[in-house]
UniProtKB/Swiss-Prot annotation:
Keywords: Amidation, Amphibian defense peptide, Antibiotic, Antimicrobial, Cleavage on pair of basic residues, Cytolysis, Fungicide, Hemolysis, Secreted, Signal. The modification Asparagine amide is found at N70. It comes from the Eukaryota. It comes from Bombina maxima (Giant fire-bellied toad). The keyword Secreted applies. This is Maximins 4/H3 type 4. It is found in: Secreted. The modification Isoleucine amide is found at I138.
Length: 139
């Protein structure tokens, strides 16, 4: 009789353990699904913000390019135009990564890419300053 009791208790313990393992697996999979959904939402929000930022920068760069395109330019304005063109290329490569990778495979120099990325920060500062100046002149 003790033997049957030991077997019954062992069976109950094994089944309880199996159920707890199964519950743990289900809760982990549910947690993974929730984490994945929240990551998708974050990526979606980030994508929307990035798209809006790119569109605003492209529009601002086009306005500044049109302003500097008409008439004579000083050497500084010419340098600003070159930087704006580089920014436009960078922004276009973000919109069309396939074309950017094709350019790279056709021998687009990696040093030039790094140089343009280093220039992108100061150019955005120049664009901001130029926009601030335009707003002051208008206002």
């Amino acid at each position: 009789m003790n033997f049957k009791y030991i077997i019954a208790v062992s069976f109950l313990i094994a089944s309880a353990y199996a159920r707890s393992v199964q519950n743990d697996e289900q809760s982990l999979s549910q947690r993974d699904v929730l984490e994945e959904e929240s990551l998708r939402e974050i990526r979606g929000i980030g994508g929307v913000l990035l798209s809006a930022g790119k569109a605003a920068l492209k529009g601002l760069a086009k306005v500044l390019a049109e302003k500097y395109a008409n008439g004579k330019r000083t050497a500084e304005e010419h340098e600003v135009m070159k930087r704006l063109e580089a920014v436009m290329r960078d922004l276009d490569s973000l919109d069309h990564p396939e074309e950017a990778s094709e350019r790279e495979t056709r021998g687009f120099n990696q040093d030039e890419i790094a140089k343009e990325k280093r220039i992108l920060g100061p150019v955005l500062g120049l664009v901001g300053n130029a926009l601030g100046g335009l707003i002051k002149k208008i206002g």
